[in-house]
């Protein structure tokens, strides 16, 4: 398969979710993150620099909270409960925290791809875009990153764990636990 054909086939996995989102927006429905931020994870962490992939479920569903990086919020925003639990575990493991706000772009700058299983959600409706076709695109991303070696895949929650079967555990490391949200963090995230 030539490079041009391969790129086209990879982009075709975006057709269904993007059509859905554009239809929602044309019908005055709000999505999170906003249209300009949907692919920020890939803008801030290039394929070639990726060392770690942290999988979440879907973006924060509150208006203007999600910024395109899984678990991240804009600087000076209050910390969502999931991110508080992530920071609590980092503090517990290494005793310090490099940043005190929820803006995780510095992680992406260091090679951490902060990726949700669904890249969008309807404002006010958690998991609302879990079946609009993001899975095919995310599968393509996992497949591409999996071709590298010594990548750490961090899978938080059942939606993220669906991708385990596509990761070569002989050349990459998988760390998985429950989602860091307060609803499930006690099932294995806290203390992991």
Can you say where each PLM-predicted feature lies in the sequence?
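Short Lys/Arg-rich cationic patches that frequently serve as NLS/NoLS or arginine-rich RNA/DNA-binding motifs
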Residues: 1-5
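A polyanion-binding, active-site-adjacent surface
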Residues: 11-155, 159-162, 167-168, 173-178, ...
């Amino acid at each position: 398969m030539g490079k041009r054909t391969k790129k086209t086939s990879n982009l075709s996995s975006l057709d269904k979710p993007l059509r859905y989102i554009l239809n929602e927006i044309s019908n005055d429905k709000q999505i999170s993150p906003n249209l300009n931020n949907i692919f920020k994870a890939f803008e801030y962490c290039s394929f070639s620099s990726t060392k770690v992939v942290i999988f979440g479920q879907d973006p924060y569903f509150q208006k203007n909270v999600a910024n395109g990086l899984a678990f991240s919020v804009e600087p000076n925003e209050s910390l969502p409960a999931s991110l508080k639990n992530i920071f609590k575990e980092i503090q517990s493991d290494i005793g310090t925290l490099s940043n005190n706000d929820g803006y995780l772009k510095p992680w992406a700058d260091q090679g951490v791809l902060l990726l949700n299983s669904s890249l969008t959600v309807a404002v006010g409706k958690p998991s609302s875009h879990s079946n609009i076709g993001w899975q095919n695109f995310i599968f393509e991303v996992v497949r591409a990153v999996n071709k590298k070696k010594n990548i750490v895949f961090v899978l938080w929650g059942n939606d993220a764990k669906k991708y385990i079967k596509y990761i070569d555990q002989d050349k990459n490391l998988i760390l998985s636990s429950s989602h860091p949200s307060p609803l499930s963090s006690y099932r294995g995230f806290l203390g992991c």
